[in-house]
């Protein structure tokens, strides 16, 4: 059995009120077009053809070499859009799925079931339908007394009886490929919209006594077509529920799943605990046994097993097992933390590698640094890595002790087991096993304060 797919993605999406093409609006981190294409891949199409039009280069870039593309210069209806794919598919034997690029909730499982139904019933056309609580605005499925599909009638063309029907057309179909393009040559624009309706091919097939069927979706939500921001928010809500439920089934605990945002490509191992208001984006992975507390935000990062991240932001970073972060820490892109590192409150790390069991507990900035293992970084330590034009590296050896309020001016190397005195400004290499003091000697002038204006004795 050879399958093909046509994805309709040419429309502007006027009701979205956006410069961005409709199919490029995102749901749970992926564009709607990407969601649709991933589901389409479940039927293993021999060729996928995407119909593009408005801002076509932007749309093309999303799928790149995964699809063939045809251009619809004028948007003259769904039938016209499918006609554009004729140059790619005409005359080929097989079954062709036609689906809109603004239906992000459709699942690959449903599309596989649709194809199987179509083949098993030897249909020339099969319509994916759903039972709508409120069918207004949808094309209705009209059946005869034997349950066979007679036609699809659009809302503006439906009579009073047809408007009462609950079974609606989702806009997704499977056709015998050859017959599809033969029938498209016979449709006209004689309707209320003055467009080429793809649905008119159903009447053509029926007139030829060819078999047309309908496969009803189990979940009406899958049929949602996104035409405005309200529908986009609905799709986001449904997708978020699917994602959190999938992770719960796989052994993840959520304290308040309704407040958690997890994107589609995030992976989470079993026995992870996620509190409320956590955001996980991009290609993030969370290792087994890790705890993410309220307010944590992680994007494109790998978090190892048995870590604890407390109300912190992590971007494009890698954390090994047993790392603790936060509260209120910020790991910026290029950060790597080895096993059992502790990054405490109000610590920022960027573009740095920190060795195992090193601790930076408070109020510290580590940028463009290589820090060894079992290092203590005292409160208030700052790596001075930028001179206004270039970034420079700081290297700290194993078991070094960086005293509180140290200023490390890069480029700089501090050797193994070295110690910097609190309050020091260090700008030259510190050899291993050395103590360095880089501050002014304390001077105390007894009784001198009485001569200053702030002293209580001066106010008399």
UniProtKB/Swiss-Prot annotation:
Enzyme class: transferase
List of catalytic residues: 362
Keyword Transferase assigned: yes
Region (Pyrophosphorylase): 1-229
Binding positions for acetyl-CoA per the UniProt entry: 379, 385-386, 404, 422, 439
GO molecular function, one term: magnesium ion binding
Role, per record: Catalyzes the last two sequential reactions in the de novo biosynthetic pathway for UDP-N-acetylglucosamine (UDP-GlcNAc). The C-terminal domain catalyzes the transfer of acetyl group from acetyl coenzyme A to glucosamine-1-phosphate (GlcN-1-P) to produce N-acetylglucosamine-1-phosphate (GlcNAc-1-P), which is converted into UDP-GlcNAc by the transfer of uridine 5-monophosphate (from uridine 5-triphosphate), a reaction catalyzed by the N-terminal domain.
UniProt-recorded name of the protein: Bifunctional protein GlmU
Species of origin: Streptococcus pyogenes serotype M3 (strain ATCC BAA-595 / MGAS315)
Gene that encodes the chain: glmU
């Amino acid at each position: 059995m050879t399958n093909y797919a046509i994805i309709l993605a040419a429309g502007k999406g006027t009701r979205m009120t956006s410069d961005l093409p409709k199919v490029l609006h995102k749901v749970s981190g992926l564009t709607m077009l990407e969601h649709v294409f991933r589901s389409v891949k479940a039927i293993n199409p021999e060729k996928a053809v995407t119909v593009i039009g408005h801002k076509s280069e932007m749309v093309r870039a999303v799928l790149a070499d995964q699809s063939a593309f045809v251009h619809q210069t004028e948007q003259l209806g769904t039938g016209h859009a499918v006609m554009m794919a004729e140059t790619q598919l005409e005359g080929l034997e097989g079954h062709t799925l036609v689906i809109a690029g603004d239906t992000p909730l459709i699942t690959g499982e449903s599309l596989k079931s649709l194809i199987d139904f179509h083949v098993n019933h030897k249909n020339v056309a099969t319509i994916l339908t759903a039972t709508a609580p409120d069918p207004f605005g949808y094309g209705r499925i009209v059946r005869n007394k034997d349950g066979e599909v007679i036609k699809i009638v659009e809302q503006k063309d439906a009579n009073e009886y047809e408007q009462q029907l609950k079974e609606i057309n989702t806009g997704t179909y499977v056709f015998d490929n050859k017959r599809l393009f033969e029938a498209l040559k016979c449709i006209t624009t004689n309707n209320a919209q003055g467009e080429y309706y793809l649905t008119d091919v159903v009447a053509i097939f029926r007139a030829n006594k060819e078999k047309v069927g309908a496969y009803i979706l189990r979940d009406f939500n899958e049929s949602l077509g996104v035409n405005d921001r309200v529908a986009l928010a609905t799709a986001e809500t449904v997708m978020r529920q699917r994602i959190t439920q999938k992770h719960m089934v796989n052994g993840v605990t959520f304290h308040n799943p309704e407040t958690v945002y997890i994107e589609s490509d995030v992976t989470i191992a079993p026995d992870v605990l996620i509190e409320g208001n956590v955001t996980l984006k991009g290609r993030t992975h969370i290792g087994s046994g890790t705890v993410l507390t309220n307010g944590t935000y992680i994007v494109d990062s790998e978090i190892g097993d048995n870590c604890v991240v407390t109300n912190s932001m992590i971007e494009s970073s890698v954390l090994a097992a047993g790392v603790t972060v936060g509260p209120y820490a910020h790991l910026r892109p290029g950060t790597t933390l080895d096993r059992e590192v502790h990054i405490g409150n109000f610590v920022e790390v960027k573009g740095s590698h920190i060795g195992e069991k090193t601790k930076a507990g408070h109020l510290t900035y580590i940028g463009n640094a290589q820090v060894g293992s079992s290092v203590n970084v005292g409160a208030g330590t700052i790596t001075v890595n930028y001179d206004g034009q270039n970034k420079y590296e700081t290297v700290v050896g194993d078991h070094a002790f960086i005293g509180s309020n140290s200023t490390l001016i890069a480029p700089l190397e501090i050797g193994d087991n070295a110690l910097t005195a609190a309050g020091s400004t260090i700008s030259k290499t510190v050899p291993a096993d050395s103590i360095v003091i880089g501050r002014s000697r304390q001077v105390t002038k007894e009784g001198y304060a009485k001569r200053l204006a702030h002293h209580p004795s001066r106010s008399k």
